[in-house]
Structure formats: structure tokens, C-alpha cells
A protein has these predicted regions:
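A conserved catalytic-core segment of Leloir-type glycosyltransferases
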Residues: 7-104
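Nucleotide-activated donor-binding/catalytic signature segment of Leloir-type glycosyltransferases, i.e.
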Residues: 263-284
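Conserved acidic donor-binding segment of nucleotide-sugar-dependent glycosyltransferases
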Residues: 337-345, 354-359
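A short, well-ordered alpha-helix in the C-terminal region of glycosyltransferases
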Residues: 347, 354, 361-373
Length: 373
């Protein structure tokens, strides 16, 4: 979208109307009609507000391609999307594909770009209508999310999208190999495209720059920040913390995030007798993340299978020394951090202890990490 000769149309389930549209057009799937309704201009304008131009609504209405009157729609003939992960997720994926059929018939475009399995059916639908090339962007696979206990329905949707794709963009070489080996894709159409982070804005820099010098902090803080699911390896973080606390007591551990393993992790910390050194603040967002990273002396990402892993870049950007698992995509491009196997809790404990007690190591990882990211 930064190229002057490129025009982007971004189709999202549920816009709020305050999105930045200076560099792309936004079409809300919740505002795209699939059932013809006889509604006047003023009413459409009042109902849609800043979410969609009424003229676009009418243009889309003219491209309804089938009788969907049996489906539940609102007074504008639109399907409502939650914008979240509801219990009827498969229904929402199918509905998204139906709506995509209207947009694909009305819009003009050269390339279709579908992000992750939730939008693959919509991408396939658009390709079948237009004959335009389909790029699927693999941010993660069910092999990553499930530790190999793959959901066959999800797998089939993922594979179908990849089979129909003209190009498969993977967030790392690690993910690319999974796509080739487990989804049986042609290596020639699979490419690795690593993620990145934006430079910190001034208000975030103001937070980060409040970090206390190493010598002023008698008690060090070690942080895990992410979903508490088996993919992220939270149990290895707690086991490593237990080993660190057998050697020193001037360290506290923060496990920030939420997920289906949260209660299990709280119990594990209690069983190891280290609950008094642990904090479980729950899910964080926005400035809370940077406040947490600013107060952290070590950041640990012990993921069992991480397609990329953006959080280490955010931590290093804040000057927080970082430890990551070798089983992560970001390990392919990051050098000024400590890399180890997720299961090697002895090495993880040694790395945490060393950073917390060696000022030179702390400063090197902090300074070089900022420079590298």
C-alpha cells in the first residue's frame, strides 16, 4: 500500500468506522448485502454511518448472485459478523465466503490475498469468480496450534486453500517446511516472508525510556507474555523459574496473558512452591504491554512451535534482553538474543540467571537488541 501504483481493498468482518483509510479502502463484510432490500438512500446513510459509502452499498447490492433470503440478515440484507471467535466459527467462515462472492463480482482487482485459514474459502470463491491469482498468507498452521493433534476440519480448510493458491506466503522458513511436508505443497510456490515491527511511536518511547538502570533494581523481573496454550510452552517457563529460584530469591516472574492453560499454570506454580514469586496479571493490550516490558529485565518466549513470534521483537525494541526457543520463526532472523530448545529448562534457567546477575550481558543484549530490531 506504500507503493504509488498499488491500490489495496481490505475486506474485514466488522469495521467500526474510525479506521485509517488514507492508504487503502475498507469494505465491511457486515455492511455488504446478500439479500436485496428496498431501502432509500437516507436510511442507508443513517444506518451505515462512517462504515460504508451508501453508493458502494447499492453497487454491491446489484451484484447479489443467488437467493439467500433463507439466511438470517438484518434490515439492509447483511449478515452480522461478531469479529471474534464465536462458537459457530465454521458458519462464520462460510458466511464470509458467501459475502466475498458479492464483493468479488463488484470490485476490480489483480491479486487476491487471503490471510490464514479463516479466509481461505473466501479467497477460493473470489478466484473461481475472477480467475485472478490467489495468494494465501500462512501465519500459523494447525500443526503449530495443536502440537500435532490436528483438527481434521481445520486441516482440510487449510490444505484446500493452499491447493488453490498460486503463491503461498509463509511467515518463516519453519512454517514453509511445515506447509511443504505436511500439506504436500510444491516448494516452488512457497516463499518465506518474515514479519517485522513498526518503529516505536513517541508516546511508547516515553514509557520505555522510564526503565530503571540495572544496578537500581534489586529484584529482577522475568516475563512471559502470550496466550497460555500448549503451543506457547508456558509450563517450561514455570519449570525454568523453579530452577532459578533454587539459586536466588531476588527474581520475580510475570506470566501475562490468558488461555485454556491459565488455571493449570497457577496450580503448577503452587505445586512447585513458587507462587509467592509469580504474578498472573491476565491479558494485556496497548500501553499495558509496553509498561510490562519496560519493567522487565528478561523476556522469555519458550514456544513449542512458533510460526514467527512478534513479541521478542517488541521486547528487544524496548531494550529488554530476550530468550527465545529455537523452534520459532523469528530465531531465523534474530541474532542478539539467547536461543535454546524449548524443552531445555536447565539452559533456560541458566540464561535467565546469567542475565539477571551479569550487568555486562544485560547491557549487551539490551543495546544490541534495540539496534538489531
Amino acid at each position: 500500500s506504500l507503493q504509488p501504483d498499488t491500490h489495496i481493498t481490505f475486506c474485514i468482518p466488522r469495521p467500526w468506522g474510525d479506521e485509517d483509510k488514507s492508504f487503502m479502502d475498507i469494505i465491511g463484510m457486515s455492511e455488504t448485502p446478500i439479500v436485496w432490500k428496498d431501502v432509500d438512500y437516507d436510511y442507508v446513510k443513517q444506518r451505515l454511518g462512517d462504515k460504508m459509502d451508501p453508493q458502494l452499498y447499492y453497487a454491491l447490492r446489484d451484484h447479489i448472485y443467488a437467493d439467500f433470503s433463507y439466511r438470517m440478515t438484518d434490515d439492509l440484507g447483511c449478515i452480522e459478523f461478531s469479529g471474534k471467535y464465536p462458537s459457530n466459527l465454521y458458519d462464520e467462515i462460510n458466511n464470509y465466503s458467501i459475502v466475498a462472492g458479492v464483493i468479488a463480482r463488484q470490485q476490480k482487482y489483480d491479486i487476491i490475498h487471503a490471510h490464514d485459514w479463516l479466509t481461505y474459502p473466501a479467497g477460493i470463491h473470489a478466484k473461481n469468480i475472477s480467475g485472478k491469482p490467489l495468494v494465501v498468507h500462512v501465519h500459523a498452521t494447525d500443526f503449530d496450534r495443536s502440537r500435532g493433534n490436528v483438527n481434521p476440519t481445520v486441516y482440510n480448510i487449510e490444505k484446500d486453500g493452499m491447493d488453490h493458491a498460486d503463491c503461498i506466503m509463509c511467515v518463516s522458513e519453519l512454517t514453509r517446511q511445515i506447509v511443504i511436508d505436511h500439506y504436500h505443497q510444491d516448494p516452488a510456490k512457497c516463499i518465506a516472508m518474515h514479519n517485522a515491527v513498526y518503529p516505536l511511536e513517541q508516546d511508547i518511547l516515553d514509557i520505555v525510556n522510564q526503565r530503571k538502570p540495572f544496578k537500581e533494581k534489586k529484584t529482577k523481573v522475568v516475563t512471559f507474555l502470550g496466550r497460555l496454550t500448549m503451543q506457547k510452552g508456558p509450563e517450561y517457563f514455570i519449570e525454568a523459574a523453579n530452577m532459578v529460584l533454587q539459586r536466588t530469591r531476588n527474581v520475580r516472574f510475570c506470566m501475562a496473558g490468558s488461555g485454556d492453560m491459565m488455571d493449570q499454570m497457577i496450580m503448577l506454580a503452587a505445586e512447585r512452591g513458587i507462587a509467592d514469586r509469580f504474578h498472573f496479571p491476565g491479558f494485556m493490550k496497548g500501553d499495558q504491554v509496553y509498561e510490562c516490558l519496560k519493567d522487565s529485565d528478561v523476556y522469555v518466549m519458550p514456544s513449542v512451535s512458533e510460526p514467527f513470534g512478534i513479541s521478542p521483537l517488541e521486547a528487544m525494541q524496548c531494550g529488554t534482553p530476550t530468550i527465545i526457543s529455537k523452534q520459532s520463526g523469528c530465531a531465523e532472523i534474530l541474532h542478539n538474543c539467547i536461543k535454546l530448545d524449548y524443552w531445555d529448562i536447565e539452559a533456560m534457567a541458566d540464561a535467565i540467571y546469567s542475565i539477571c546477575h551479569n550487568e555486562s550481558l544485560f547491557n549487551y543484549l539490551a543495546e544490541e537488541g534495540i539496534r538489531e530490531v
